[in-house]
Amino acid sequence: MKKSLMMIAGLFFSVLSVAGQGLSMDRVNADFQKKKEALPTGDLFSVFRQQLTQEERDALTFFYAYMSVGDITDYSGDFYLENVRSSLTTRKETTWGKTIPDDIFVHFVLPIRINNENLDRARMVFHDELMPRVKGLSMLDAVLEVNHWCHEKVNYQPADARTSAPLATVKTAYGRCGEESTFLVAALRSVGIPARQVYTPRWAHTDDNHAWVEAWVDGKWYFLGACEPEPVLNLGWFNAPASRGMLMHTKVFGRYNGPEEVMYRTPRYTEINVIDNYAPTAKADVTIVDADGKPVADAKVEFKVYNYAEFYTVAS
């Protein structure tokens, strides 16, 4: 058995496939029809009977094609339509909106869900508060300003409960790294800036994990510590640890076909590897052989890092 791998700082992780480019609305529509057929009762798709522009219809179709059943049943169509309209309006009113490709917009601006938080009206609330602060700024400076705003609202405090919703995080004024990064992604998307939560499941240097944010600016992804403002992007306390990390990944809503390595696909999201943004990498091949030197078919390969007194599997 032969696997394609990528190496960083002497460690390996699995590369399962390489995605293509572009967004296929034909595929989105097909997935949407499957979702409708799977949920024939409850009138869960009634929002599509409203007067909608083609942009609104396409955006809602994308939402419903890849949302979980829980999100479809727990929140109304009007809730999703309000979020869609806010995102489309923001795209038109910002100077950077026209520079964002459609596939980046639908995967990294349009989606509401970031983690396992309850969904709320944060997009509209944050938009109204943040737009005056980012008006007239470049896209890069807007990212920095939004993070300053997040720092004003939320401080770090460790916790183990389910991820707090963005508006709940404002109310408590604290959150762990996963909540702070969820908060920053929600804030950036509210002003039309593509953003994604990045996660390393285990550090190589200490018994812990971490989550932070990447923002898309003028065609390139940059990282930043959530609610930890710095004067520039690609700077955080975790620069050195990330350069030694075994895996940095994010889950992208829908069928994403960007340039990053695809680790895993489900009917709802695409898990991608973004380790290239943190250290030089190289591809390597690992072949599993038996005692006679013959390749082993369907062998299970796991790549582990020592953390919390165990070898933790980060990819298999």
Task: Identify the meaning behind each predicted range.
Residues 291-309:
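Short, ordered, surface-exposed loop/turn motifs in non-cytosolic proteins
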Residues 27-172, 207-208:
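Secondary-structure boundary elements
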Residues 1-24:
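Bacterial Sec-dependent N-terminal signal peptides
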Residues 282-290:
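A short, amphipathic beta-strand motif
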Residues 22, 128-135, 142-148, 157-167, ...:
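Hydrophobic/aromatic-rich core segments of domains that either
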